[in-house]
Design a protein with these regions (language model features):
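Residue-level signature of mid-helix packing/kink "hotspots" within the transmembrane helices
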Residues: 41-49, 131-135
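Loop-to-transmembrane helix entry/capping segments in MFS-fold secondary transporters
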Residues: 30-31, 113-126
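A membrane-interface helix-boundary motif in multi-pass transporters
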Residues: 142-161
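Helix-to-loop junctions at the C-terminal end of transmembrane segments
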Residues: 46-59, 145-146
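Helix-loop boundary and gating motifs at the non-cytosolic
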Residues: 1-36
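Intracellular juxtamembrane helix-capping segments at the cytosolic ends
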Residues: 100-114
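Helix-loop junctions at membrane interfaces in 12-TM secondary transporters
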Residues: 79-91
């Protein structure tokens, strides 16, 4: 599961990090970038608020897998967006991707290790599934963005989640 989280995050974090390039490629400027960032951030809040209720219906592992699927869907939807309006409309998918990922990964790490090892489990989750994946995803995506633009970067993001 840690490997799936690594690749899911490696695919989705460059979208946040290079959102300015995505907005510019759709004809937007600073105002549109602010709107896109707002939509992404605001859509994560409901996920955090309803996570406890959702977890009563399914395991954190299942929620984690669902979030990774939506991390794969988001770059595909961005690829399909032909206008700035469509790009902005895609941003709330963050609710079902990263919005669910973060609380589910915390709970999953706690459930997967012995109580005495939970600090190490959370540290490993943070280092591998978030820090290293973001570092590598951003490095590769930045290169691909220079090499072939946002389309190539988004195909990389999609491929990471598979």
């Amino acid at each position: 599961m840690l490997i799936a989280c690594f690749f899911g995050m490696m695919g989705v974090m460059p979208i946040s990090n290079f959102l300015v390039s995505l907005v510019n490629s759709h004809g937007g400027g600073s105002t549109a970038l602010g709107a896109a960032q707002f939509l992404m951030a605001a859509s994560e809040l409901p996920s955090a608020l309803v996570f406890g209720l959702l977890q009563k219906r399914m395991s954190s592992a299942k929620i984690l897998l669902i979030s990774i699927v939506f991390m794969m869907v988001k770059p595909l939807l961005i690829l399909a967006s032909g206008s700035l309006g469509m790009l902005l409309a895609v941003q709330p998918v963050q609710m079902l991707g990263y919005g669910l990922f973060f609380p589910a990964s915390v709970y999953f790490a706690n459930e997967s290790v012995a109580p005495a090892d939970r600090v190490q489990g959370q540290s490993l989750r943070t280092i591998v599934a978030i820090s290293l994946s973001t570092l590598l995803g951003s490095l590769v995506s930045g290169y691909l963005l220079d090499l072939g633009g946002t389309t190539l970067m988004l195909w990389f993001s999609t491929g990471c989640a598979f």
